[in-house]
């Protein structure tokens, strides 16, 4: 039962945070949002590795949902740096990479958890922090200041994502 709660809360936080992070990346650039999300995710995995109670793991999953919401920013980054004729292919590669990650991640987590239940969190923290360092040193900004827009809570409202569902309700 708790596994379902943990998964639902992660997805709910990602749903709420995705449009906010997207709007922040439109305002401040893709790079800072991606960097802060990777840093936050790395620190969050450390929190979960050290969590003394189930409650702390729950807090960690909430934070993880927010920081994982930067996927929209990653897709925006790819849209910024690829030509329109290569964009669909690039999005397909990203989708495949995420799919492979969702297959390999739990399997690797199971192997690592057999060694220690906290080891998967430490390894995930290492990957996230390595991604942060890579981005800090190598990742250029893809969204130039002249293309940035003001932050708008109206655009960042996650309820607005549900609006297209009205097409199916009569």
Segments (PLM) and residue ranges:
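MFS-fold secondary transporters
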Residues: 44-48, 64, 135
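Residue-level signature of mid-helix packing/kink "hotspots" within the transmembrane helices
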Residues: 11-19, 69, 102-103
């Amino acid at each position: 039962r708790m596994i379902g709660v943990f998964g639902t809360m992660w997805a709910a936080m990602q749903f709420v945070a995705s449009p906010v992070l997207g709007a922040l990346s439109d305002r401040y650039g893709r790079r800072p949002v991606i960097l802060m999300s990777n840093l936050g995710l790395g620190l969050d995995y450390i929190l979960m590795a050290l969590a003394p109670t189930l409650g702390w793991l729950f807090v960690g999953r909430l934070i993880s949902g927010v920081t994982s919401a930067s996927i929209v920013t990653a897709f925006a980054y790819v849209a910024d740096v690829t030509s329109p004729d290569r964009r669909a292919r690039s999005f397909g590669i990203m989708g495949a990479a995420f799919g492979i990650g969702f297959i390999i991640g739990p399997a690797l987590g199971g192997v690592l958890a057999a060694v220690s239940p906290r080891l998967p969190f430490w390894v995930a923290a290492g990957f996230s922090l390595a991604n942060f360092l890579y981005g800090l040193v190598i990742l250029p900004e893809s969204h130039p200041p002249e293309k940035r827009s003001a932050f708008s809570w109206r655009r960042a409202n996650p309820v607005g994502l549900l609006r297209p569902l009205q097409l199916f309700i009569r």
